[in-house]
Amino acid sequence: MTLKNYLFLLVLLLAAGVRAQAPSGNAYPKREFRAAWIQAVNGQFRGIPTEKLKQTLVGQLNSLQGAGINAIIFQVRPEADALYASQHEPWSRFLTGTQGQMPSPMWDPMQFMIEECHKRNMEFHAWINPYRVKTSLKNQLAPTHIYHEHPEWFVTYGDQIYFDPALPESREHICKIVSDIVSRYDVDAIHMDDYFYPYPIKGVDFPDNASFARYGGGFSNKADWRRGNVNILIKKLHETIRGRSGHQAVGEVRNQPVRYLPQSENRSVGQQHKWFAEL
Protein backbone atom coordinates (compact mmCIF):
# COMPACT_ATOMS: atom_id res chain seq x y z
CA MET A 1 0.00 0.00 0.00
CA THR A 2 2.40 2.64 -1.21
CA LEU A 3 2.29 5.55 -3.64
CA LYS A 4 5.61 5.02 -5.37
CA ASN A 5 4.59 6.89 -8.49
CA TYR A 6 3.72 10.13 -6.70
CA LEU A 7 6.02 12.54 -4.90
CA PHE A 8 3.31 14.98 -3.98
CA LEU A 9 -0.47 14.90 -4.02
CA LEU A 10 -3.30 17.20 -3.10
CA VAL A 11 -5.32 15.50 -0.39
CA LEU A 12 -9.06 16.06 -0.56
CA LEU A 13 -11.41 15.26 2.29
CA LEU A 14 -14.52 13.64 0.89
CA ALA A 15 -16.90 15.42 3.21
CA ALA A 16 -20.08 14.43 1.40
CA GLY A 17 -21.57 11.01 1.04
CA VAL A 18 -19.43 9.12 3.52
CA ARG A 19 -22.50 7.37 4.90
CA ALA A 20 -23.66 6.22 1.51
CA GLN A 21 -23.55 2.54 0.58
CA ALA A 22 -20.27 1.72 -1.16
CA PRO A 23 -20.63 0.42 -4.74
CA SER A 24 -20.06 -3.30 -5.09
CA GLY A 25 -17.52 -5.07 -7.24
CA ASN A 26 -14.92 -3.03 -9.10
CA ALA A 27 -16.97 0.14 -9.50
CA TYR A 28 -14.07 2.31 -8.33
CA PRO A 29 -10.95 2.84 -10.45
CA LYS A 30 -7.95 1.01 -9.02
CA ARG A 31 -5.98 4.17 -8.12
CA GLU A 32 -8.87 6.41 -7.06
CA PHE A 33 -8.07 8.18 -3.80
CA ARG A 34 -11.01 8.32 -1.38
CA ALA A 35 -9.86 9.70 1.95
CA ALA A 36 -11.25 10.79 5.29
CA TRP A 37 -9.59 12.68 8.12
CA ILE A 38 -9.65 11.56 11.74
CA GLN A 39 -8.60 14.52 13.85
CA ALA A 40 -7.47 14.77 17.46
CA VAL A 41 -7.93 18.47 18.23
CA ASN A 42 -11.71 18.28 18.62
CA GLY A 43 -11.17 16.46 21.91
CA GLN A 44 -12.70 13.14 20.93
CA PHE A 45 -9.71 11.15 22.28
CA ARG A 46 -8.82 13.12 25.39
CA GLY A 47 -8.90 11.07 28.58
CA ILE A 48 -10.83 8.17 27.01
CA PRO A 49 -9.84 4.76 28.44
CA THR A 50 -7.57 2.90 26.07
CA GLU A 51 -9.86 -0.02 25.23
CA LYS A 52 -12.87 2.23 24.71
CA LEU A 53 -10.85 4.50 22.41
CA LYS A 54 -9.61 1.52 20.42
CA GLN A 55 -13.19 0.33 20.01
CA THR A 56 -14.25 3.79 18.87
CA LEU A 57 -11.47 3.97 16.28
CA VAL A 58 -12.24 0.48 14.99
CA GLY A 59 -15.89 1.44 14.66
CA GLN A 60 -14.97 4.56 12.69
CA LEU A 61 -12.74 2.56 10.38
CA ASN A 62 -15.44 -0.04 9.78
CA SER A 63 -17.96 2.66 8.90
CA LEU A 64 -15.54 4.43 6.58
CA GLN A 65 -14.54 1.19 4.91
CA GLY A 66 -18.19 0.41 4.32
CA ALA A 67 -18.60 3.81 2.68
CA GLY A 68 -15.79 3.10 0.22
CA ILE A 69 -13.01 5.08 1.88
CA ASN A 70 -9.57 3.67 1.05
CA ALA A 71 -7.25 6.09 2.89
CA ILE A 72 -7.24 7.46 6.43
CA ILE A 73 -5.53 10.74 7.31
CA PHE A 74 -4.90 10.47 11.05
CA GLN A 75 -3.67 13.43 13.07
CA VAL A 76 -0.49 12.47 14.94
CA ARG A 77 1.25 15.81 15.63
CA PRO A 78 -1.11 18.72 16.41
CA GLU A 79 1.18 20.98 18.53
CA ALA A 80 4.78 19.74 18.16
CA ASP A 81 3.66 16.80 20.28
CA ALA A 82 2.76 13.21 19.48
CA LEU A 83 -0.07 10.71 19.33
CA TYR A 84 2.61 8.06 18.95
CA ALA A 85 5.76 6.98 20.78
CA SER A 86 7.92 9.84 19.55
CA GLN A 87 11.64 9.86 20.20
CA HIS A 88 11.75 13.66 20.12
CA GLU A 89 8.46 15.22 21.26
CA PRO A 90 6.10 14.76 24.23
CA TRP A 91 2.84 12.85 24.27
CA SER A 92 -0.07 15.01 23.14
CA ARG A 93 -2.57 16.55 25.54
CA PHE A 94 -5.19 15.64 22.94
CA LEU A 95 -4.66 12.00 23.90
CA THR A 96 -4.11 11.99 27.67
CA GLY A 97 -5.33 15.44 28.72
CA THR A 98 -1.87 16.59 29.80
CA GLN A 99 1.01 17.14 27.41
CA GLY A 100 3.91 14.85 28.22
CA GLN A 101 1.78 12.34 30.12
CA MET A 102 2.08 8.80 28.76
CA PRO A 103 -1.11 6.85 28.09
CA SER A 104 -1.93 4.23 30.71
CA PRO A 105 -1.90 1.41 29.92
CA MET A 106 0.80 2.24 27.41
CA TRP A 107 -0.17 2.01 23.74
CA ASP A 108 0.77 3.68 20.46
CA PRO A 109 -2.27 5.13 18.63
CA MET A 110 -0.42 5.59 15.34
CA GLN A 111 0.87 2.01 15.28
CA PHE A 112 -2.59 0.75 16.21
CA MET A 113 -4.20 2.74 13.40
CA ILE A 114 -1.60 1.65 10.85
CA GLU A 115 -2.31 -2.00 11.64
CA GLU A 116 -6.08 -1.54 11.59
CA CYS A 117 -6.00 0.44 8.34
CA HIS A 118 -3.79 -2.08 6.58
CA LYS A 119 -6.04 -4.94 7.74
CA ARG A 120 -8.78 -3.21 5.75
CA ASN A 121 -6.56 -2.51 2.74
CA MET A 122 -6.68 1.21 3.56
CA GLU A 123 -3.72 3.55 3.28
CA PHE A 124 -2.54 5.28 6.44
CA HIS A 125 -1.42 8.91 6.13
CA ALA A 126 0.32 10.48 9.12
CA TRP A 127 -1.12 13.99 9.49
CA ILE A 128 1.22 16.56 11.02
CA ASN A 129 0.96 20.28 11.68
CA PRO A 130 4.56 21.36 11.05
CA TYR A 131 4.79 24.86 12.56
CA ARG A 132 2.13 25.06 15.26
CA VAL A 133 3.19 24.74 18.92
CA LYS A 134 0.31 26.25 20.91
CA THR A 135 -3.26 26.87 19.83
CA SER A 136 -3.68 29.08 22.90
CA LEU A 137 -1.18 30.77 25.17
CA LYS A 138 -3.12 29.34 28.13
CA ASN A 139 -2.09 25.80 27.21
CA GLN A 140 0.81 24.36 29.19
CA LEU A 141 3.81 22.83 27.42
CA ALA A 142 5.47 19.75 28.85
CA PRO A 143 8.85 20.31 30.57
CA THR A 144 10.47 18.22 27.83
CA HIS A 145 9.01 20.29 24.98
CA ILE A 146 11.58 21.65 22.52
CA TYR A 147 10.23 25.16 23.19
CA HIS A 148 11.92 25.22 26.60
CA GLU A 149 15.26 24.15 25.17
CA HIS A 150 15.25 26.55 22.21
CA PRO A 151 12.81 29.43 22.78
CA GLU A 152 14.69 31.41 20.12
CA TRP A 153 13.24 29.14 17.43
CA PHE A 154 9.68 30.29 18.09
CA VAL A 155 7.44 33.31 17.61
CA THR A 156 4.20 34.34 19.26
CA TYR A 157 1.50 35.56 16.90
CA GLY A 158 -1.87 36.46 18.35
CA ASP A 159 -2.77 33.82 20.91
CA GLN A 160 -0.60 31.11 19.35
CA ILE A 161 3.04 30.03 19.20
CA TYR A 162 4.77 28.77 16.05
CA PHE A 163 8.14 27.60 14.87
CA ASP A 164 9.69 30.49 12.93
CA PRO A 165 9.56 29.11 9.35
CA ALA A 166 12.61 31.20 8.38
CA LEU A 167 15.02 29.46 10.72
CA PRO A 168 17.13 26.55 9.48
CA GLU A 169 16.83 25.07 12.97
CA SER A 170 13.04 24.97 12.68
CA ARG A 171 13.21 23.15 9.37
CA GLU A 172 15.81 20.71 10.68
CA HIS A 173 13.64 19.84 13.67
CA ILE A 174 10.53 19.29 11.54
CA CYS A 175 12.51 17.10 9.13
CA LYS A 176 13.87 15.14 12.10
CA ILE A 177 10.33 14.43 13.26
CA VAL A 178 9.25 13.26 9.82
CA SER A 179 12.39 11.15 9.43
CA ASP A 180 11.60 9.44 12.73
CA ILE A 181 8.05 8.67 11.59
CA VAL A 182 8.90 7.25 8.17
CA SER A 183 11.82 5.20 9.47
CA ARG A 184 9.91 3.55 12.34
CA TYR A 185 6.33 3.33 11.09
CA ASP A 186 4.80 1.76 7.99
CA VAL A 187 3.04 4.93 6.87
CA ASP A 188 1.89 5.37 3.29
CA ALA A 189 2.21 9.14 3.24
CA ILE A 190 3.03 12.21 5.29
CA HIS A 191 0.13 14.65 5.23
CA MET A 192 0.83 18.30 6.12
CA ASP A 193 -1.83 20.65 7.41
CA ASP A 194 -1.05 24.35 7.95
CA TYR A 195 2.16 24.02 5.95
CA PHE A 196 2.09 27.79 5.33
CA TYR A 197 2.58 30.89 7.45
CA PRO A 198 -0.36 31.60 9.81
CA TYR A 199 -3.39 33.37 8.40
CA PRO A 200 -2.98 37.12 8.84
CA ILE A 201 -4.38 38.86 11.90
CA LYS A 202 -5.80 42.21 10.88
CA GLY A 203 -3.40 44.99 11.77
CA VAL A 204 -0.75 42.64 13.17
CA ASP A 205 2.31 41.65 11.14
CA PHE A 206 3.89 38.26 11.66
CA PRO A 207 6.90 38.96 13.94
CA ASP A 208 9.77 37.94 11.69
CA ASN A 209 11.63 41.24 11.15
CA ALA A 210 14.76 39.90 12.84
CA SER A 211 14.69 36.75 10.73
CA PHE A 212 14.18 38.77 7.56
CA ALA A 213 17.15 40.96 8.43
CA ARG A 214 19.28 37.88 8.99
CA TYR A 215 18.10 35.58 6.18
CA GLY A 216 16.30 37.83 3.72
CA GLY A 217 19.28 38.70 1.52
CA GLY A 218 18.35 38.58 -2.15
CA PHE A 219 14.65 39.22 -1.53
CA SER A 220 13.08 42.63 -2.05
CA ASN A 221 9.93 41.87 -0.07
CA LYS A 222 8.78 39.59 2.71
CA ALA A 223 6.07 37.85 0.70
CA ASP A 224 8.56 36.34 -1.76
CA TRP A 225 10.96 35.54 1.06
CA ARG A 226 8.26 33.77 3.06
CA ARG A 227 7.26 31.75 0.01
CA GLY A 228 10.89 30.82 -0.37
CA ASN A 229 11.04 29.63 3.25
CA VAL A 230 8.05 27.35 2.73
CA ASN A 231 9.57 26.05 -0.50
CA ILE A 232 12.79 25.19 1.33
CA LEU A 233 10.89 23.18 3.95
CA ILE A 234 8.94 21.28 1.30
CA LYS A 235 12.13 20.47 -0.61
CA LYS A 236 13.91 19.31 2.55
CA LEU A 237 10.96 17.17 3.60
CA HIS A 238 10.86 15.64 0.15
CA GLU A 239 14.55 14.79 0.38
CA THR A 240 14.14 13.47 3.92
CA ILE A 241 11.28 11.17 3.04
CA ARG A 242 12.79 9.86 -0.17
CA GLY A 243 16.10 9.33 1.56
CA ARG A 244 14.63 7.37 4.46
CA SER A 245 11.86 5.40 2.80
CA GLY A 246 12.18 5.64 -0.95
CA HIS A 247 8.46 5.64 -1.56
CA GLN A 248 6.14 7.55 0.77
CA ALA A 249 4.16 10.43 -0.63
CA VAL A 250 3.85 13.91 0.82
CA GLY A 251 0.40 15.47 0.92
CA GLU A 252 -0.67 18.99 1.79
CA VAL A 253 -4.03 20.43 2.74
CA ARG A 254 -5.69 23.32 0.96
CA ASN A 255 -8.86 25.13 1.88
CA GLN A 256 -9.35 26.59 -1.60
CA PRO A 257 -9.83 24.89 -4.97
CA VAL A 258 -6.70 24.40 -7.04
CA ARG A 259 -7.89 26.88 -9.67
CA TYR A 260 -7.31 29.66 -7.11
CA LEU A 261 -3.62 28.91 -6.65
CA PRO A 262 -2.29 32.38 -7.60
CA GLN A 263 -4.57 34.13 -5.12
CA SER A 264 -4.03 31.57 -2.38
CA GLU A 265 -0.27 31.88 -2.78
CA ASN A 266 -0.54 35.50 -1.68
CA ARG A 267 -2.52 34.54 1.39
CA SER A 268 -1.04 31.28 2.63
CA VAL A 269 2.43 31.57 1.13
CA GLY A 270 2.75 28.34 -0.80
CA GLN A 271 3.76 27.55 -4.38
CA GLN A 272 2.23 24.18 -5.11
CA HIS A 273 2.69 24.41 -8.87
CA LYS A 274 6.42 24.93 -8.28
CA TRP A 275 6.61 21.81 -6.12
CA PHE A 276 4.83 19.70 -8.72
CA ALA A 277 7.14 20.94 -11.46
CA GLU A 278 10.47 20.68 -9.65
CA LEU A 279 10.24 17.87 -7.09
Please tell me what each predicted stretch does.
Residues 48-67, 94-120, 173, 228-239:
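Aromatic- and glycine-enriched glycan-recognition loops and surfaces
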Residues 31-33, 39, 43-55, 115, ...:
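Active-site-adjacent "subsite" loops/lids of carbohydrate-active enzymes
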Residues 55-82, 184-189:
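Catalytic domains of carbohydrate-active enzymes, especially glycoside hydrolases
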Residues 40-44, 78-82, 130-134, 196-198, ...:
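Solvent-exposed loop/turn segments at secondary-structure junctions
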Residues 70, 77, 120, 142-144, ...:
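Polysaccharide-binding and catalytic clefts of secreted carbohydrate-active enzymes
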Residues 11-20:
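Hydrophobic h-region of N-terminal signal peptides that target proteins for export
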Residues 69-104:
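Aromatic-lined carbohydrate-binding/catalytic grooves of carbohydrate-active enzymes
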Residues 2-9:
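Sec-dependent signal peptide recognition
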